[in-house]
């Protein structure tokens, strides 16, 4: 049951899959979480370690679960050409963030909320070494 005044919105299929993965995290030390290694298999990199950056691997894996072809790349910024740019984010849309001047550095996840002051909430992989919902500016 929804609380009074709570918005009811349809959750895109890919976002429902992503929500189900919240809490998946890296194994400290020499071990590797098999689920994160599985995410990597959705990319051409096919990494076998949870120490390899995996935000794009997670996004590709999520899309694959619902029959949508992602970028196939482990590079976060590969998603910049996968979809069309939006002037305002839509619940569940892909968010790509640049990091520094390195053209390969970035982060990708799924938009879940705006908080004001240019802050957004993103559900993504490899956020503090886990699948989480985190705040970004």
Residue ranges of each PLM-predicted region?
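N-terminal capping segments
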Residues: 1-66
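Intrinsically disordered, low-complexity, charged/polar segments
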Residues: 133-137
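...with weaker cross-activation on analogous glycine-rich loops/strands in unrelated enzymes
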Residues: 7-11, 64, 68-132
């Amino acid at each position: 049951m929804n609380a009074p005044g709570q918005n009811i919105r349809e959750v895109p299929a890919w976002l429902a899959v992503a929500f189900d993965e919240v809490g998946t995290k890296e194994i400290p030390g020499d071990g590797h979480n098999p689920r994160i290694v599985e995410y990597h298999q959705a990319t051409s990199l096919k990494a076998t370690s949870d120490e390899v950056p995996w935000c794009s691997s997670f996004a590709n894996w999520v899309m694959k679960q619902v029959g949508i072809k992602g970028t196939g790349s482990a590079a976060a910024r590969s998603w910049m050409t996968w979809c069309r740019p939006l002037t305002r984010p839509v619940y569940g849309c892909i968010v790509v963030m640049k990091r520094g001047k390195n053209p390969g550095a970035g982060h990708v996840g799924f938009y879940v909320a705006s908080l004001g002051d240019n802050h957004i909430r993103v559900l993504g992989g490899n956020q503090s070494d886990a699948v989480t919902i985190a705040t970004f500016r």
